[in-house]
Amino acid sequence: MYRIAFDVNGNDNGVAAAVKASCQFLKENDNYEIILVGDEALINNELKLIENIPNSLKIINNPNVPSDVKNFHKSLRENTSMNDSIDLVAQGKADAVISSGDSGTYLACATFKLKRLQGVSRSAFMPLMPTIVGRKFLLLDVGANIECKSEYLVEWAKIANVYARTLLNIVNPRVSLINIGTEDYKGLEIVKEAAKELKDNKFINYIGYSEPRYLLDGVADVAVIDGYGGNLVLKSLEGAILSFKNLLKDKIMAKPIRKFGYLFLKGAFQDVAETLDYRNVGAAWLIGLNGLSIKCHGNSDSKAYLGALNQIKLVIKNNVLEAIKKELNDKPHE
């Protein structure tokens, strides 16, 4: 039986989405147990709306959230649902933790409690991203580290390489560094240094630099960048996708003839929307820790949470954490 600790207090819209997704996941996976950590009264109110509640759904009552997300030291000491959830993994009582709470607080608490893996200098946030060709790619770091060194980029590439084999089902993932151009002489020194080391790593399929504008074309399976640039790339891609959807909708609704034509193209438009829907992947992994940890959007709905839970299932099933430890020691995967 595998166990997932779920901090349900961090969602902007309450606990309903987390409860619904958890019940759906457990009905489809009878070898899992989910421990909902949050306001028990609110959780039970939502459970009243669900038929056939799985017996493998457990509750730990803790209605508290961090009182000051800018004060990480204070957050570490507080009795919160986030800390309780992470503690379950740290104590070996759960196999993974999931939360929608404040990103900085989650990063600090998870890093302090779970500890970094040997050979890892810094943790990083790593979401699965959609492309227009249907396949997905891993983007990291998207905000955990504003300042960066070349060794961080190399370490993250090694870790993401393992995740990509499992989450993307690719034997030899294409690993790339995001840069302002594809030429070797372009970019910051830390990027050039990381590129040289990745080229020399015989266990990584390093394909060179990738420009941000081509990421949605599926040019790489793993795209690595510092946290500052990665956060800008993430928000730019998410914003561009959303703006495109809204623009397309406005143009269709602007004229009656276009509305009529939409009736015949509705299926194609829905396919495009589904392909670019971030909720299908649901979350960002907090990588580099000695424990599985995943962070969801603060406004996640049940579809996004279910996507995150299914990612956790894949990673647990394929024993990714142990594979990462081997990768960090430059040992080939089996």
From Swiss-Prot:
Metabolic or biological pathway, per its Swiss-Prot or TrEMBL entry: Lipid metabolism; phospholipid metabolism
GO biological process: fatty acid biosynthetic process; phospholipid biosynthetic process
GO MF term list: phosphate:acyl-[acyl carrier protein] acyltransferase activity
Catalytic activities: a fatty acyl-[ACP] + phosphate = an acyl phosphate + holo-[ACP]
Xref: Gene3D superfamilies: Isopropylmalate Dehydrogenase
Subunit structure: Homodimer. Probably interacts with PlsY.
Name of the molecule in the record: Phosphate acyltransferase
